[in-house]
């Protein structure tokens, strides 16, 4: 276990995980409360579609044009999801529509990459990321970007929380749901585009949903729920990275499994605490 702490790339990967967890746990609160759990996977897949297009167009994989293509596709997804809220009134669940977008984007990625030599490797990297090989400069850049997104959310927290907790009430008070949703999903897409390149689709989804679910399971107080989510993300990231080095396993799936184990343990503890209360 201790040998992991002596490896420079361990600390870079850990810091990257914590940077991701910081903003994802907060965004996850909104996503879980809005009931659009799989929007992260769908937007991440839209970003992957943009990268796949860049690969076919022979654009430099780590260059700015690849990033812009990926970001452009996530903005398309953001606009689609903002529009789709209105379709819920036609008795079509939002999650079903999100699932269609996700499946179509993923199928398109497979079709595009089927004829490329690096297709299989690219798909794998999209899923599991590259935490142990991430450039520290990229981590700093992403941290600054997330700080800007966090600042924007702090300034706009009132309308965002109103729409998250009571969208129909917010609309009745004059909030334009489409435009506020567009702003939310655009910032969300900007976050996902950057994080998928580091951690992959699977871990990004895990860091978004699992800490938020853990916090909301434990308490209804937003601040406390966020704190619980951040602690779980920290412990789960350390457990996953140490296990990854110890057993020579991919980093992102190891962290995701660790987060799930912690969530299950928390659920057991909360259940056991509720039983004595039920008897009294």
What residue spans do the PLM features occupy?
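Membrane-interface helix termini and inter-helical loops of multi-pass transporters
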Residues: 1-6, 59-62, 118-134, 242-245
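Membrane-interfacial amphipathic/re-entrant helices at transmembrane-helix boundaries
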Residues: 1-22, 64
